[in-house]
Amino acid sequence: MTTEPLALDFKSATLYAIRVVLHSADPDQLAEALGRRMADAGSFFENEAVVIDASRVSAPIDWPALVKALGAHKLPVIGVVAENGNLERARAAGLIPVELSAPRTQQSVDPAPPNHVSTPVPAAPEASRAAQEQLRSAMKGDAQAVPTRAARDTTEAASHTPAAPQSSTALVITKPLRSGQRVYARHTDLVVIGMVSQGAEVIADGNIHVYGPLRGKAMAGARGDTSARIFTTHLDAELLAVAGVYRVVEDRLDRNLHNQPALVRLNGDTLHIEALKS
């Protein structure tokens, strides 16, 4: 019996992938929508693995053309979700069927209107009040104010099922993130103590807390948790996203939000940004 190691081995792995949901089979409409989405998001989704979800489309899909269009935007396709004839055509095109075991509760990926900012909610839920207290403590220099897990709105928790199990311990980053750096907190919250520079990306399956200037891109609820939120002591982000609903911040935010403590959350299909007053 040989003791030499084998040339390969099998290890478990969990892949992060973007779910591209099709609402049409028309190649021209898909190409136009893809171009607009990528123009809005800049380089945020570039080189991210993609699963094409065609479960809502019954018309025949030109899979090779769609894969080529996604590839032109640096979006490699690793699998598809489809039914009946489209599933067979996907297999014939060399694509791999996959199962999404936990479909997201938030279906819309439409960005919020460019100039839409919600007003502060007078009767904030418990999660918002807890986050406000955490941010106030952080702004006063209380090092023990950093949470290991953010509180969730109990009403939202009852009506929305998270797309993936959440860990009880947050991923804590205690140094600034430079341009080009990316941090992903899988199945948990992300806490950054320091600046997230322009060009840096922070992603979490749960909530995101930035105790410092948030100048890069932030995506909370990456696996579809619509109750996820983004908290920061200084809001100046390039892009904000919760459960796939995103907003590119092209123009400076209102004075009561720019470089101020803020909360970002979903309200239905709309991304809301709220000031957190100290």
From Swiss-Prot:
Domain of life according to the entry: Bacteria
Keyword Cell division: yes
Keyword Cell division: yes
Coiled-coil region list: none
Residue numbers spanned by region Disordered: 104-167
Biological process, per Gene Ontology: cell morphogenesis; division septum assembly; regulation of cell division; regulation of cell septum assembly
A Pfam match: MinC_N
Annotated keywords: Cell cycle, Cell division, Septation
Protein family per UniProt: Belongs to the MinC family.
Subunit comment: Interacts with MinD and FtsZ.
Function description: Cell division inhibitor that blocks the formation of polar Z ring septums. Rapidly oscillates between the poles of the cell to destabilize FtsZ filaments that have formed before they mature into polar Z rings. Prevents FtsZ polymerization.
Name of the protein: Probable septum site-determining protein MinC
